[in-house]
């Protein structure tokens, strides 16, 4: 990885390549912060005191270079098994205020752990971040954790008991077949999570 500083144009090119939408300076700053939050185990942490700033120094420049190279090589860009593209809102840019990508740190770490424990063959998120417009369009709750970037809809192939015993999540949504299809980190307890059941169609 290069230790030199990237130019603003290079930063924008790399962020766009890995999935971020950047039309303004404000969106670029948002994207840099989201990149730092999501960046996990592909290099040194980019957080300072657990927080992300919009400054791009040598370490962040090197991380952006690596993420860009991994994207070009068809590898994950955010963590060992997940890419920023997998977290982005599925509105496709239909809503002008959509930030596109804003996963929480905990969501990334927990999904890596869940994959290792229950999905060793691979786990593809069904839905992660949602902007207000898209969340409303798909019938999501007004207080949906997808709006905050800490909820992920997953393939419902594992039972409530299996997912619950991992003690990773405080919110679990269960399909009529008894398998979990939604996990989140709302305020609460991972040992006694909030559980709800979706009705059949």
Predicted regions and their residues:
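Cell-envelope/ECM-targeting effectors and their regulatory/trafficking segments
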Residues: 1-116, 141
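Generic non-transmembrane alpha-helical segments
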Residues: 18, 113-121, 162-168
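Surface-exposed patches in mature extracellular/periplasmic domains of secreted proteins
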Residues: 23-24, 52, 120-129, 171-176
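A mature extracytoplasmic/lumenal domain signature
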Residues: 56, 60, 68, 127-129, ...
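Short, solvent-exposed polar/charged micro-motifs at secondary-structure junctions
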Residues: 65, 133-139, 182-186
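Extended, low-complexity, intrinsically disordered C-terminal regulatory tails
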Residues: 111-139
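Catalytic cores and adjacent binding grooves of peptidoglycan-active enzymes
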Residues: 141-201
